């Protein structure tokens, strides 16, 4: 099982190298062909893909990129192609040189499968690996190629981001400044209002303490327990008040105590 995984990894790496044009040939109509072939035929040079598409009114979106090499973005059965300058000066499609890889998959697959079975049957001793130059089957190539195509399309789309321009940057900076000013105004307004309220509370407490200090003696005099009560004074004199004597009211005894005196 381990040998099968090792063989699969080696074959996948070889397939990726071939798909990116490291050997100059291509598989499956060259949809993933990436070799630097700038001329479809002697005497002709490929035009830049972006310039050629901008010069055509009904040019499809190829997504080949900003270069002038042979590619096959529309999966043309004839293989990679490019735009060349026609007789009238208009860009026209021209197939590139057919550089298909030799079809050795039918021979390589049984050989590699047999070698894998033989390696699995060896009970011990030296391990036998499949040759590194064995090419994979077309089913394996088809399973790996779509992932590469998606990554290529994502890479092209990331490069085609539009620049906002000077006006966009100015508007963005202006909005940021406005937001910062509004936030600073809110903070300053809250701080000022809070300080004003605290100052008013402090002044009110000072006034209350001053009023208490002024009104304290008056309250002491109005206290019922401290009121002064006026008392009546009785004066006793030493001399007796004279009494008028009337007739018949004289006493029978004098002061000396002698009757009839």
From Swiss-Prot:
GO CC terms: extracellular space; plasma membrane
Membrane topology: Single-pass type I membrane protein
Role this protein plays: Negative regulator of hepatic phosphatidylinositol 3-kinase (PI3K) activity.
SS bond partners: 25-101, 46-82, 70-96
Ranges of biased composition (kind: Basic and acidic residues): 90-101
Keyword Membrane tagged: yes
Gene: PIK3IP1
Protein name: Phosphoinositide-3-kinase-interacting protein 1
Extracellular side: 22-166
Keywords tagged on the record: Cell membrane, Disulfide bond, Kringle, Membrane, Signal, Transmembrane, Transmembrane helix
């Amino acid at each position: 099982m381990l040998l099968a995984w090792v063989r699969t990894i080696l074959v996948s790496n070889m397939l990726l190298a071939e798909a990116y044009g490291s050997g100059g040939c291509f598989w499956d109509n060259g949809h993933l062909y990436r070799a630097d072939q700038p001329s479809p035929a002697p005497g002709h040079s490929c035009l830049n893909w972006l310039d050629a598409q901008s010069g055509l009114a009904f040019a499809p979106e190829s997504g080949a990129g900003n270069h002038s090499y042979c590619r096959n973005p529309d999966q043309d059965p004839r293989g990679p192609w490019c735009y060349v300058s026609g007789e009238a000066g208009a860009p026209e499609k021209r197939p590139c040189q057919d550089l298909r890889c030799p079809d050795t998959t039918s021979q390589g697959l049984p050989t590699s499968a047999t070698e894998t079975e033989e390696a699995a049957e060896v009970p011990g001793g030296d391990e036998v690996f499949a040759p590194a130059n064995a090419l994979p089957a077309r089913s394996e190539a088809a399973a790996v190629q779509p992932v590469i195509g998606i990554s290529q399309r994502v890479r092209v789309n990331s490069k085609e981001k539009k620049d906002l321009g000077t006006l966009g940057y100015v508007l963005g900076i202006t909005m940021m400044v406005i937001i910062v000013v509004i936030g600073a105004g809110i903070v300053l307004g809250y701080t000022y209002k809070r300080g004003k309220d605290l100052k008013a509370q402090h002044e009110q407490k000072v006034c209350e303490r001053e009023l208490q200090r002024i009104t304290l003696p008056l309250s002491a005099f109005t206290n019922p327990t401290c009121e002064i009560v006026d008392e009546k004074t009785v004066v006793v004199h030493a001399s007796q008040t004279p009494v008028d004597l009337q007739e018949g009211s004289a006493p029978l005894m004098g002061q000396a105590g002698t009757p009839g005196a």
